[in-house]
Amino acid sequence: MAGFKVPSWITYKSFWIAVSSSVTTACVILGTLEFRKHRSIRRLQSMIVPEAGKSIQLSSSGVPIEIYDAGEEDEGISKGVPYDENLIREQLARNYAFFGEDGMERLRNSFVIVVGCGGVGSWVINMLARSGVQKIRIVDFDQVSLSSLNRHSIATLQDVGTPKTLAIKKAIKKFAPWIEVDARNALFNPDSADDLLSGNPDFVIDAIDNIQTKVDLLSYCYNHKLPVIASTGSACKSDPTRVNIADISATSEDPLSRATRRRLRLLGIMEGIPVVFSTEKPDPRKASLLPLSEEEFEKGDVDELSALPEFRARILPVIGPMPGIFGLTIATYVLTSIAKYPMDPISTMTRPRLYEEAVKRLHAEARKAGVNLDKTFNASEMSYIIEEVYVGRSALPPHESQKVTVVRWNPQLPFDHTNLVAMTRNEARYHEDNVLAKNVDPSTVYGKDVIEVVHSFLRRLRMWEMLY
């Protein structure tokens, strides 16, 4: 410190005290900053799923399976852990107050299978577990995506990229550890049905959004007499006042439900499956199926964009609460059914005799016209044409709904279902006498307005044939 002179008012001792205090303060500040830095690094590292000890394998169906450290119980059956019965009853106190001892005994001895663990299925599973269902098997091949967090009831950011079944199973352990969860990271198909639906379940819940997989599941349950309830599409829906439960034969205004009904009817299944659906009609002002960009089409095969072959590649817009409403509705239906809680659901009816009469009329008309049919019509097809295409009413104004049948529209066109029109019996007799018997074009008998209405129905039928 040459040339530096300490002021006379500062003593030698006080000078070094000041220097040491400054050094100490600097060390404390730097140490604190370094500590905060390391703490932030550790926090960020804890948010990242560790890769060590984890590998990717494919199941027999080509679905990725996450394999974690052997010390973690992530896949398969979680037997549940010993848990004090008094604590269980306290946690389920409101359910005991609602269902009573007998109802809760049924629920706590029940076994439910949920196929599909996405927006709808996750809400179903969540409430079944919170309501005391003792054993739940959950089936899904897919993984949690970031975009699915807007509607999934359980998954978190840390679950993104992991199997949906694993995310749900781990979550249930945190609030109901006594429940047995059988997590199956698998794709449901006819080959896996016997295994995935084994164990004599009290209920099977269909929360699938793929048409053919849904049909495979529902037809299996129907043929094996397994109690089942299905969810139709909650995407593009926004009106909660229009959500209903009805027999599948009475549902409407939903493309997924319509396509499912049609395929089930071709398998001879016309009714007997309850579904949750929305009566909300499509509206050009509302959300609809998003088209693929021209860029994706230019790249080549757009089917490669889907998760699996025959699964949709285009995006269905969905507002988060709607899958929850569907799922909670299903959960309530299943819980009250298993507990045998008094319910008075609105009944829906089909008209099997009417369908059979329509079949007989068509075959009689073919014989009378000397037409050799390539195939015989059946009641399932008549049900589809009358109830789906013509909404249970005559195609001719004023569109009456009583005593509806089906007739060939234009005798100069092929005798197939794309040339069939719903009419009342009186209208059908008039049509047979003035159009079919004279072998003339319907436009020579009916006015322009009637022709346009009928053709709009026929266009709808042909469009649905192409789509579904």
From Swiss-Prot:
One of its GO terms (biological process) is cyclic threonylcarbamoyladenosine biosynthetic process. It is found in: Mitochondrion outer membrane. Gene3D superfamilies: NAD(P)-binding Rossmann-like Domain. The chain crosses the membrane at residues 15-35, 109-129, 315-335. Keywords: ATP-binding, Ligase, Membrane, Mitochondrion, Mitochondrion outer membrane, Nucleotide-binding, Transmembrane, Transmembrane helix. Belongs to the HesA/MoeB/ThiF family. This is tRNA threonylcarbamoyladenosine dehydratase. It comes from Schizosaccharomyces pombe (strain 972 / ATCC 24843) (Fission yeast). The lineage of its organism: Eukaryota, Fungi, Dikarya, Ascomycota, Taphrinomycotina.
